Amino acid sequence: MTGRFIVLDGIDGCGKSTQIRHLAQWLPASGLMPSTAQLICTREPGGTPLGQSIRELLLHTEADQVPSVTAELLLYAADRAQHVDTVIRPALLRGDWVLSDRFAGSTLAYQGYGRGLDRQLITRLESIATTGLEPDLTAWLMVPVEVSLQRRHGEKEDRIEAEGRAFLRRVADGFAVLAEQRNWSQIDAQQSVSKLSQVLEQTLRETLQ
């Protein structure tokens, strides 16, 4: 595969979506990508038509249809398998670049550390869903839990976002462990939007050039 796979990850409210939009404009003009490559911007869950249906089940489910924690884990794995098989891997094989809002690390952080599910089981499911595909760069956007909650104050929450402070703190701790284990780029996301954009641009240049 000749394309590149870039992931932004972190707890809710870390600024991923804003920076994805920035990088979607910056990357094609940066000189990093071959002139023949396209940039595919995507997300998890919901990066495919099937995945969008799974996203609705995961995040916006009616009270009488909430999945169990095991069913939730398997739905995330199904979303990822479809995403890798039909979007990410084909794009990389074409030589295109893929920029994703979340990937496998989020499942370990949220379902493993947040929910307390067996992390070895999650890792095995990750291997099945991704068939060994790993990002060329994962940037973890670091913000304290209090900052995340403050940024999202007053916004409508999905089912996962509504889990509360203690859950989010466990997830944040999980991301910190994973970032060390998997050698992710760790980026202070408390900076201004423009400064954070500059740091991400430099990180991409240093890693992918």
Swiss-Prot record:
Q: Which GO terms describe its cellular component?
A: cytosol
Q: Where does ATP bind?
A: 10-17
Which enzyme type, at the first EC level? Answer: transferase
What Pfam families would the database entry show? Thymidylate_kin (PF02223)
Molecular-function annotations in GO: ATP binding; dTMP kinase activity
Under Gene3D superfamilies, the record lists: P-loop containing nucleotide triphosphate hydrolases
Q: Which reaction does it catalyse?
A: dTMP + ATP = dTDP + ADP
What PANTHER family would the database entry show? Answer: THYMIDYLATE KINASE, UMP-CMP KINASE 2, MITOCHONDRIAL
- Family, as annotated: Belongs to the thymidylate kinase family.
Role description: Phosphorylation of dTMP to form dTDP in both de novo and salvage pathways of dTTP synthesis.
Report the protein name in the record.
Thymidylate kinase
